[in-house]
Design a protein with these regions (language model features):
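Post-transcriptional modification and biogenesis factors for structured RNAs
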Residues: 1-178
Length: 178
């Protein structure tokens, strides 16, 4: 919850059936974020997701990377790596669903997703570590979803000293922009 609040998530929905109740220890660890971030208690996650979709939301299911090409389409679902995701929240309201540490998402919930999204590391397929723990993956995915687009150039009249700003077409590769 702390990372979700810090990164700008609007609310967190928690299933009543398949998750442990939010404990006082978890609330304390959230460092106050749980008091500022709406927590939605969901009795029927499948029905909740259907209702969200009917109201225009896109649903993304976080899954462990498999090593196969993640940027593909199968049936009515698109598989995408976080690095190729872009900034989906700029285009539509989004729900990111996360599963448990060991089991991941239940099949009946996973099938509700429009997209399967994974975080791929540079060492995929090398060694025995093939995934992240859920909290780390959640933080990385939330940052990806909520990342603000970078402004490369400023309007000509934005600079206080009267100097001229370059527009984005004038920026060449290899330049470092802050």
């Amino acid at each position: 919850m702390r990372s979700a609040f810090f990164l700008g998530v609007d609310a967190v929905a928690i299933s009543n059936r398949s998750t442990a109740p939010v404990s006082p220890v978890a609330l304390k660890a959230s460092a106050g974020a749980s008091e500022s971030l709406p927590l939605i208690s969901v009795n029927q996650p499948g029905t909740f997701l259907d209702s969200c979709r009917n109201n225009g939301w896109k649903i993304y299911a976080a899954n462990a990377a498999t090593g196969a090409d993640p940027n593909q389409r199968s049936g009515n679902k698109t598989y995408v790596s976080a690095s190729a995701l872009g900034n989906p929240i700029q285009n539509h309201a989004c729900i990111l669903i996360l599963g448990s540490e060991g089991e991941g998402l239940r099949w009946n919930i996973k099938k509700k997703a429009d997209y399967d999204v994974c975080v791929e590391g540079p060492r995929m397929g090398q060694g025995r570590v093939d995934s992240l723990n859920v909290s780390v993956a959640a933080g990385l995915l939330c940052e990806t979803f909520l990342r603000r687009p970078k402004r490369i150039g400023a309007p000509r009249d934005d600079l206080p000293d009267g100097s001229q700003a370059r527009n984005h077409q004038e920026v060449t590769s290899g330049e470092l922009l802050f």
